[in-house]
Amino acid sequence: MLTVVKKEPTPEEIKAWLSTVSGFIQGATKIDDRPTRLYDYQVEFNECRARFRAVLKSRQTGFSFAFAAEALAKAHLKPEHTAIFVSYNLEDAKEKIRYARMLYDTMPLAWQKKLVTDNKTELEFK
């Protein structure tokens, strides 16, 4: 007989998880009033520490969302972090800003950095 026992994470484990990009996204943001859940490939991509990352992708695979979520998380986890979205066209870049703003709006107020610039092409936090 197999018994599954749920163990509550310790405060240290929660802090360590939230200090990662994927943990922050999944622990601090929501989609449709439910915690954000990333696919395994999104977690793997976000946690990659390589200086340069290249992706050969098709459309509608969730990478635009992952890029926006990663930029938002790093802006909150790292001081003086800057993310630049280079896209096929301006509308595609604006879409990533919209995703980041949507996730920012779902974060607990106590965790939100102050939003000092908010327009269609830029978000700046202090």
Q: Locations of the language-model features?
A:
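Phosphate/NTP-binding elements of NTP-utilizing enzymes
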Residues: 2-126
